[in-house]
Amino acid sequence: MKNQYFGDIGDYKKYSLLRTLTLGGQLRVLVCWMLTSNDERTDGKFIHYLNAPAQWRRYDAPVFDFLAQHVLIRNERRVESIETHGLIPNATFHSALLTDGQAARQQYFAELGQRTAQ
């Protein structure tokens, strides 16, 4: 996951699925972004669905409206946006930046393990 991809069609589906899986907040979910630094790739360009609310909004209106507001209007593409909004009820997020070094990755997954124990 990269912040530059935030709000693309895959995210719309992913966030809607997570909302469904929590049963409206009855179940807890831990979201591990495996967030890496932005780069020059254009993988996050698939946001045209946000310009077609008649086709896409009906599947999960709160998620669609949230992403349209943040991506199209505010031009704000950061996973932190969804974390602070509370759109995925009863969710905990592991959003530390994941780097390539072996020691850093071991630390990353150790921290993730601690979060699962909570």
Task: Enumerate the language-model features and the residues they cover.
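Class I S-adenosyl-L-methionine-dependent methyltransferase catalytic core
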Residues: M1-Q118
